A protein has these predicted regions:
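Short active-site oxyanion
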Residues: 42-47, 130, 206-207
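Hydrophobic helical membrane-anchoring modules
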Residues: 200-202, 207-232
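N-terminal glycine-rich phosphate-binding loop and ensuing alpha1 helix
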Residues: 2-49
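A conserved hydrophobic position in a structured secondary element of the catalytic/binding core
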Residues: 50, 107, 112, 181-183, ...
Length: 232
C-alpha cells in the first residue's frame, strides 16, 4: 500500500494574512503538520499543494515536497480542499505516481501529533470505509439551538426540545478541520465526504481549534502549551 499526504496551503488568506506560515510559538504554523506527517511513518510522500512561492519555500525547508504549483483557479476563496486534493492526485498520476490512500492534512492543525495520525490511519484501514476524518462533539446540544431574525427576535430551530434534558438528546458532532483519509478512488469519485460511506476519528476538544482569526490563533497557542505541559 502506498500512502500520500497532501497539505493544501493557499496564499490568499484574508482574516489572518499569511496564515499558513505565520509564527506559531517560534515556527511557521504549517511546519507542525509537515513534521507530524513525516514523523508518523505512515506516508511514502508528504506533498504540498500551494499557489504561493513563499509557502512552498517554507514547506520544502521542513521536509515536504512541492512537485507542482497549484492553479490560481483552485486557490481563491471559493476553492474547496476536495478540489485541491483531486487536482493533486491527478497531477501525480500523470507523473506515474500512484497511491492507494491519500490523506488531506490541514496546514492549520498544530494541536495534532504523529500518534493521532497513526491511530486514525489504523482505524481507517480497519473500517474499510471510503473516508475517515477528524471530528469532535458539539459542546452544547444542537437541538436547542436558536437563530435571530431581522428584528433580533429569538426563534428556536425546533421548540419541541426546549425542555429536553441534555442527556436525553442525541450527541452531535462536527468536522474538526484537521485531517481526512480516503482511498484515491474515493477522492476522485466523490465530492462530499459527510455521508454514511465515511467514518470518523473523534478528537477531544483540547485538540481542536479552527484558526480563522487572531483570537483563534492565540487560543490555539494556549491549548498547545497546556496540552504539552499536561503530557509531562
Amino acid at each position: 500500500m502506498k500512502n500520500l499526504c497532501i497539505i493544501p496551503a493557499r496564499g490568499g488568506s484574508k482574516r489572518i494574512p499569511r496564515k499558513n506560515i505565520i509564527d506559531f510559538l517560534g515556527k511557521p504554523l504549517i511546519s507542525y503538520s509537515i513534521e507530524n506527517a513525516l514523523n508518523s511513518g505512515i506516508f511514502d510522500e508528504v506533498v504540498l499543494s500551494s499557489d504561493d512561492e513563499e509557502i512552498i519555500e517554507v514547506a520544502l525547508k521542513y521536509g515536504a515536497k512541492a512537485p507542482f504549483m497549484r492553479d490560481k483557479n483552485l486557490s481563491d476563496d471559493y476553492a474547496s480542499s476536495t478540489a485541491a486534493v483531486q487536482n493533486a492526485i491527478e497531477i501525480l498520476q500523470s507523473q506515474n505516481q500512484i497511491y492507494d490512500h491519500v490523506c488531506c492534512l490541514y496546514a492549520t492543525a498544530p494541536l495534532l501529533n504523529k500518534n493521532i495520525l497513526k491511530q486514525a490511519y489504523e482505524k481507517f484501514i480497519q473500517n474499510e470505509s471510503k473516508f475517515l476524518f477528524a471530528a469532535t462533539e458539539f459542546e452544547y446540544p444542537i437541538q436547542r439551538a436558536f437563530y435571530l431574525n431581522e428584528n433580533n427576535q429569538v426563534y428556536m430551530f425546533d421548540e419541541k426540545h426546549y425542555k429536553s434534558r441534555s442527556q436525553d438528546l442525541t450527541k452531535a458532532y462536527h468536522d474538526a478541520g484537521a485531517f481526512y483519509f480516503g482511498t484515491s478512488k474515493a477522492w476522485l469519485e466523490e465530492d462530499f465526504i459527510f455521508k454514511p460511506h465515511s467514518s470518523v476519528f473523534v478528537l477531544p476538544r483540547n485538540l481542536v481549534c479552527d484558526i480563522d482569526t487572531m483570537q483563534d490563533l492565540e487560543f490555539a497557542k494556549i491549548l498547545y502549551k497546556a496540552n504539552h505541559e499536561s503530557a509531562f
